[in-house]
């Protein structure tokens, strides 16, 4: 099984953009098993809707929120078309969708949503996902907060798929401190789903050693004749 795991891991990393496929994994001479492989890139977009346009992260974020966090399936194009039709089209073309556009769209589907200035821990307590605006590399971008636990924030990013980051890193990107949440239909909300977290597991070494903890560890300086 170690051989199968090693081969599978190599294929997973080596083909990040490849679709799901079946490969034959040999576990012993003359014995092989078909294994379905899914690339990391494909897995990250399994529960996050990928945005089609540079300015459509808002429609992709709301499609992610409804489809995967509230069980109300809708594709990005449908959300985009409806919000664009009822919004300020000139402004949308320059700046993308606003939270007001998203609020109106959600209301048309029976969801009551508003923005709140509350700490991230409140989402964990209430068990509800949220849309937030982050500023990454100079670009404003809507993402869905799918989970938060043990100092890690799980995001449904329409541009990069489901990914996790430290709370410190998230706070640096989340400059306006506003969470946009649906406050009815609470029984339908999905937050901290194991299926979502499975795509972005913490690295084992990161759990055991803090980066700063490596500072005192140095290689000894060897002298002549030392091995």
Predicted regions and their residues:
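Conserved active-site-adjacent core of cysteine acyl-enzyme catalytic domains
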Residues: 22-42, 83-192
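Sec-dependent signal peptide recognition
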Residues: 2-8
